[in-house]
Amino acid sequence: STLMRSSAASDVYKRQIEKCAEEDRYDFVRDILIRYKDLKRIYGYKIKDYWRNIASVDDYYSTNMDFLKADVRNYFFKQYPDVYSKVDDLPPAKYNPGSQVRNSLVSSGCIVNGVVENSVIFKKSYIGNNCVIKNSIILNDVYIGDNTHIENCIVESRDTIRANSYFVGEGEVKIVVERNERYVI
């Protein structure tokens, strides 16, 4: 039956993912699709337009930043509007007096009190007074205290950035801020 085939395929897929993780290999395309294409029955669909392989933190960063480009947004939300995600019935983002947002995506449930430029802000995040967020990705449920400067960073979900903090990645170097720790990539 179709259900049994789907379940069996899912089990094989899960085993391959676990095997790759044990060997510290995390690139789905290189480590699974290409590696097993001649050994397993792998089928695909040719994508003519936008597609990115996210195999590193830099890939994750650049792919998120691609959504700041109008042509990429239009591809997903106008040309193919049937892209669905989880719905959280949250209020729209709130921009308080004095806030400034330029070339950024700010999700529902966010409150912005500072300056946000060229950044992607995921849902339910709070940007404090006099903050500057530039060229960064702020994941879900992040609290950023007042007078904080974040640039060229990825801030992990459910993190709290204390007031008067300063995180700046230089050039191609990105900083991943995770649970009040700092990792340079």
Task: Label each residue range with its predicted role.
Residues S1-A9, Y13:
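Single conserved hydrophobic/aromatic residue that forms the stacking wall/gate
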Residues S10-I17, Y60:
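A generic structural signal for short hydrophobic patches within well-formed alpha-helices
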